[in-house]
């Protein structure tokens, strides 16, 4: 006890101040970052499980919102609608990429005297790899980025909190509806994209290089088993659900004002593209890695 404590008339600033004892600052440890990353991954997986688990309830309670989002996914809004929405973007991307496949395939096969097999190149590579990846990129760049921006704007404007206050389950209403709409819409969109990639390859081979249409169609149909088309649709449906989940997650948890929304959109596009590339490798190995549905000889 000091002399100041014994003087009842001491000035308040001279008396010792008693307050909460703050814990000492802990130095960062080497495993903090991996642990934080693991915790973030667990939160994301929990969010995805919550979204997918709410599908039956959402189908029952919000059918009109799902239909509205179906139109938005297919035809877009604002400036995106001017170019035909997601349909227009997918048509353009698959047409030109399919044309490149036909052009490069013909040039490579012509060097060894087997240019007549260019129909095989289109049927094999467009179906298994090229069309699903291009469709996934188009979906991420249009629908996914739009969903991230929408949910991010709602989050920073406190609209998500307002839904919670009104007892509306925000995850069901904002995220699950978008996942359902994207899953349903990707099927006709991918039909258009896959057929357009086939048309691009055929157009280059027949009209640019002058190959007989009958020859091209013969080898194209010969090396296109129906199971490959079904598995191609399986890939793009898995891609679509994963892309929308990633974009909605980052938009739903955006913070930091308009700049934060922009960062969320960029992070969502990067993450979805990398995830699709890794998942494409895994699914291709699982679906076609140990067996083949096409035999060129034998």
Predicted regions span which residues?
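Short, membrane-interfacial amphipathic segments enriched in basic
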Residues: 20-68, 250-255
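Membrane-interfacial helix-loop-helix connectors in multipass membrane proteins
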Residues: 97-127, 195-237, 246-267, 290-298
């Amino acid at each position: 006890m000091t002399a100041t404590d014994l003087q009842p008339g001491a000035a308040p600033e001279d008396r010792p101040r008693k307050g909460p004892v703050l814990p000492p600052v802990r130095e960062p440890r080497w495993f903090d970052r991996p642990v934080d990353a693991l915790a973030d991954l667990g939160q994301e997986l929990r969010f995805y499980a919550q979204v997918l688990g709410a599908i039956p309830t959402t189908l029952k309670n919000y059918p009109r919102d799902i239909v509205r989002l179906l139109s938005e996914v297919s035809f877009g809004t604002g400036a995106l609608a001017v170019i035909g929405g997601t349909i227009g973007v997918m048509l353009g991307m698959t047409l030109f990429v399919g044309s490149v496949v036909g052009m490069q395939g013909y040039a490579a096969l012509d060097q060894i005297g087997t240019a007549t097999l260019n129909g095989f190149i289109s049927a094999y590579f467009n179906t298994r790899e090229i069309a699903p990846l291009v469709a996934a990129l188009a979906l991420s760049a249009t629908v996914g980025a739009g969903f991230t921006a929408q949910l991010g704007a709602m989050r920073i404007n406190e609209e998500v909190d307002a839904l919670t206050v009104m007892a509306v389950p925000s995850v069901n209403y904002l995220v699950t509806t978008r996942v359902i709409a994207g899953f349903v819409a990707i099927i006709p969109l991918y039909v258009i994209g896959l057929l357009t990639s086939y048309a691009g390859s055929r157009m280059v081979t027949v009209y640019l290089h002058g190959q007989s249409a009958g020859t091209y169609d013969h080898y194209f149909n010969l090396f296109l088993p129906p199971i490959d088309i079904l598995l191609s649709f399986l890939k793009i449906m898995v891609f679509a659900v994963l892309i929308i989940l990633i974009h909605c997650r980052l938009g739903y948890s955006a913070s930091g004002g308009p700049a934060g929304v922009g960062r969320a959109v960029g992070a969502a596009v990067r993450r979805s593209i990398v995830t699709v590339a890794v998942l494409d490798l895994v699914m291709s190995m699982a679906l076609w890695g140990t067996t083949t549905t096409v035999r060129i000889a034998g």
